Amino acid sequence: MLFYFELVVILLCTKLAGDISVRLGQPSVLGKLIVGIIIGPAVLGIINSSELIDELSEIGVLLLMFMAGLETDLEELNRNLKSSFAVAAGGIIFPFIGGYVTGLLFGLIQSHAIFLGLLLCATSVSITVQTLRDLGKMNTRESTTILGAAVFDDVIVVILLAFVMSFLGTQDVNITLVIVKKIIFFVSIVFIAWKVVPWIMKMLVPLRVTEALISAALIICFSFSYYSEMMGIAGIIGAFAAGIAISQTEYKHEVEHKIEPIAYAIFVPVFFVSIGMEITFQGIGSQLWFIIIMTLIAIFTKLIGSGLGARLTGFNLQSSISIGAGMVSRGEVALIIAANGLTANLLAKENFTAIVIVVILTTIITPPLLKKYFV
C-alpha cells in the first residue's frame, strides 16, 4: 500500500516541478531532478528507495534511450562517427587526468587516485536526451554526435575498468574476454538489427491482440537491453540500439507515437526522482571541499575535453561547447562504476558517499548548461 502512495507523490510532484521549471525558463527535467532530492531521504524523507522504485526507474531510463534511438538519424550518426569518437576520447583523457591529479592532491593512494580518474571518464546521456527533447533539439548534428560519443565512451570505459580492476583491484578479470565480448556484441547487434528485427516485427504485428505493435517493440527493446547487460555493456546502449533498429522499419512513427505516453506517464518520472533520491547529506562535512573540487573538475574536464574533440573535427565554438555540455552528466553509469570500486577496495567508503553527490550534481547542472549553450 505504501508503494501506491509513493507513486502518487512521485507523479504529482514531478509534473508540478517540471511545470515550474519550464515557467522559470529551464528544461522540465531540472525540476524533476530537484524534486527527487526534496522528497527523498536527503530532505523530507517522504520517498525511500525500494526494489519496486528501482525497477520502474530502470524501465524508465531504458524507454528514454529507446525513444532516443527511434529519433536518431542513422545516416547522420554514420557521418559523425569520427566526431563522436573524438568527443569520447577527449571526454575520457581530460577527466582521467583531472580525477587522478585531484585524488593525489587530496592524499589518496595511487590505486584509488587512478580509479577516481576512471570514474570521472563515465558519461550517461539519459538526462541529456531528455533535456534535448524538452528543447526540441534531438534531430541535430550535435545531438547525434553526443549519442554516438556516449556509445564509444561506454565501451572504452568498460574496457579500462576491466584493466584497472584486473591490475589494481581484488577481483580477477579476464581482459581478453572483456574485449572479445564487446566485439561479439557489436557485430551481432548489427546483424540482429538489420535482419532479425524486421522479421520479428512482421511476425508479431499482425497478431489479433490489442497493441501487438507496441508489445513487439517493447520485446525488442528489453531483449536488446538484456543482451547488452549480459555482454557487459550498459543496458541503455542496448535500448538505444533497439530504437535505431526499429527506426529503420515502416513502424517507426507509430511506435514513437505510442511509446512516449507509456514512458512519460509513469516510468520516466520515477527515473528522474530516483536519481535525486541517491543524495544523502549525512557525514559530508569532512568531505565538503573534496565534493566541491571534484564537482568542478568533473564538469570542466568533460566540457573542455569533449568540446575540444568536437572543435578538432569541424564544429564551431558554440556547437563544441554544447556538445561538451551534453557529455557532463555522469548519471547511473558512474554510480555503477563507483559501486564496483567500493567492492574491489579501489574506493574508500567516505569517498564513495562524496562521489555519489558529485555524480548527482553533474547530472543536475547538465540541463541548465544545455539550455544556455544549445542554440
From Swiss-Prot:
It is found in: Membrane. The chain crosses the membrane at residues 27-47, 89-109, 112-132, 145-165, 183-203, 204-224, 226-246, 261-281, 288-308, 350-370. Keywords: Antiport, Ion transport, Membrane, Sodium, Sodium transport, Transmembrane, Transmembrane helix, Transport. It comes from the Bacteria. GO terms for molecular function: antiporter activity; monoatomic cation transmembrane transporter activity. Coiled coil: none annotated. Its main location: membrane. It is a multi-pass membrane protein. Gene3D superfamilies: 1.20.1530.20. GO terms for biological process: proton transmembrane transport; sodium ion transport. One of its GO terms (cellular component) is membrane. Belongs to the monovalent cation:proton antiporter 2 (CPA2) transporter (TC 2.A.37) family. NCBIfam families: 2a37. Contributes to the success of spore outgrowth from the germinated state during alkaline or Na(+) stress. Does not have a significant role in germination. This is Probable Na(+)/H(+) antiporter GerT. It comes from Bacillus cereus. The gene is gerT.
